[in-house]
């Protein structure tokens, strides 16, 4: 009997597109998917182009047959896996993040030259972007980085079938969850401080006084998401474990958990909510945490408030304080009537409540102010403890809104205008995460600890980087003062010297926070690691309560719950999960950062330059270096200009070697400046020959060239403001920075 022959499917699995696979892609994908209509906007009727389409189809079919005979390859469709990998490879090249082999580019260019109306050659990323649009891999205006993302952004539809078991009608009733017997009911108010657009509320802050000692205690109430998405359940495996994080992109939010689960677990004002509670006290002298603990509870009184509303409250307090100080200083020389009039004016100007929620009382204001003062103390403590190692990571981040048709609707500030309110929330969350880490370490629990890896060779090089010979730093307008843009550049340099934070199953040092006691526990609706922390600590709470009850079994509404609850995640399993989460979250973070840049540049090209081609951006100078004595800089830029998307000389073939051209040329620029574009909250590098562009200066820049998909932006300085530094012109550049804030 003749043995059965099994044909093995060979798939493209590498990152190098050689000639053979390039030809397979051309025959099995490019010629079958090519459609020049994808490059044009909808305008002409389909009937008018039907004849041309039929003619093009015949040409493509004839070309496919001819190439199949010449190359001795079958003209059959590529398998989905190979096609997807090759398309992602081409997309990475189109976005400027990857490289392509010369042989593959030559094969593609040779075939395209035979197709009527197609890009004649694929020589650079912009040509590749047009090719991907022509074969329908992406639509005009699409974020190509998102389209080519290799990770998962959405859970499979089959996950929705597993939700019903966790969304029963009785789940809102006390006793339907095994841990309800351990929950403590809280009737004190808790404040959820978020953006106005936030739909998933997973944390709130409360301040209570111990009835016995009278000491102040802070409580961070976190949504108990593991009630509705338990560890190792089919729902958890297909959603949270698969995605590991919610990905926030300007064009949309890709949730880690299904919307019904988020709606059930989120903290709400209209019903009691199950919470994971983190309690701690802050030493008023040292600022360190003390008397901390974790538990579970019911929250009955949630108060939602936005960052803008809290910031207005803090600004009002600062304004009243300044007026009070000014009034006291002048009242010594004023009559009694004048003093009384001044007091009335101070109260009138400081007592506005137009932007406050209707529920806010004097006691609520006092609690919110107390949260801010405690956060300031914690921030100062961390800064003092870290010393020179302290990293200021509060960089600006614009809020970009994208509408239908890939249209950028707005670019607004979401950090600088509400900095104090965000500091209050951030420090409370950092403290809560530190408490969870300490409790886990003290009880030998394996959780996803958060920290930074040891420095790689690239980070060591960045940390010890020195400018090339001949580069000189230009002195600031005021060497004794740290300007806004200057402080930002220092933070960027500090961050370049540390690695991205990762998760590890044992305690790990966090360079950014200068501590070994850190994890993530306050955002379980958007981070899988937080759910794992909750699971481990809740199992420990169950076991602790079981032991304290004399060995008796705690009763529950679910018969099988004691067996499930008493199973913590094994250390080797936690190690595997931490590695997986770190990898996926890093991919998501890179996608979010690159997408922010893409949509910002798209906003420049789509909205600003179409209305005003010579629009001038107000920019702050954060650093300037003189390179007129550093020939390496000039030589490097000449080579870069050769590879740039546009050639000033029309791409004429040069016969003089690059080294020879460099020796024959003068310097094209004398200075390199790091600037900050206030209108876009965007840091950039500008090359120029203007000696007045120094740290602290305010300049105006015009756009020379912009390519959003490639992340390419070229600016030219056209004016330097005279008569002062950025402090004098602060109202003008802040007006560009915060155009959406009436305050």
From Swiss-Prot:
PANTHER family: MITOCHONDRIAL EXORIBONUCLEASE DSS-1 (PTHR23355:SF60), RIBONUCLEASE (PTHR23355). Residues 325-344 have a biased composition (Basic and acidic residues). Belongs to the RNR ribonuclease family. SUPFAM superfamilies: Nucleic acid-binding proteins. Residues 320-357 are annotated as: Disordered. GO terms for biological process: mitochondrial mRNA modification; mitochondrial RNA 3'-end processing; mitochondrial RNA 5'-end processing; mitochondrial RNA processing; mRNA catabolic process. Its EC number is 3.1.13.1. Keywords: Exonuclease, Hydrolase, Mitochondrion, Nuclease, Transit peptide. Residues 186-542 form the RNB domain. Its main location: mitochondrion. The keyword ATP-binding does not apply. This is Mitochondrial exoribonuclease DSS-1. The gene is DSS1.
